[in-house]
Amino acid sequence: VAESTNEPGRATSVHHVVFAVMAEQLPETAQFFSELGFRFQTIELEDVGLRVLLDWDGGLELVTPLGADGSGEVAQFLQRNGPGVYSVVIRVDDAQAAEQVAQRYGSRTQFQQHRGGDGFELDEIEISVLGLPLTLLSTDLP
């Protein structure tokens, strides 16, 4: 096992798990997790065609496509696999540097975005590396 370094791109923690859910299953799925104690904030990301239910503190995110046209990564995932774990989000100090590390292991970048405003910055890069669905997240949010 290789020793970790203090190079940029270092992981700081597993941040949260993302489940892809069919639109018609979202209310019941959210209710189930709510009864377990999760508290979701709903975010409509029209620019990427997603409805997101996020419990940032609880470490859980539910995503479903907004449209019925079947386009987008989440819709394609659901068509191929049905509902399930879409990604495990790894918090890193520098998402771009972590992506470079992953590229040395043959990663494939599927999506990346930068969001900011209202006092926050967030960089997110979805990758597949060594067969694992991961998202690299660097942010100044807690």
Residue ranges and their predicted role:
Residues 34-41, 105-109:
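Conserved acetyl-CoA-binding loop of GNAT-fold acetyltransferases
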Residues 2-5, 68-75:
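Short amphipathic beta-strand starts and helix->beta connectors
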Residues 39-56:
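N-terminal strand-loop-strand beta-hairpin
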Residues 65-66, 79:
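DNA polymerase sliding clamps and clamp-related checkpoint/processivity subunits
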Residues 1-31, 36, 85-88, 140-142:
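N-terminal beta-strand motif that seeds the catalytic metal site of vicinal oxygen chelate
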Residues 43-47, 72-77, 105, 114:
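Short, tandemly repeated low-complexity microdomains enriched for cysteine and small residues
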Residues 1-10, 13-24, 51-64, 73-142:
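Vicinal oxygen chelate
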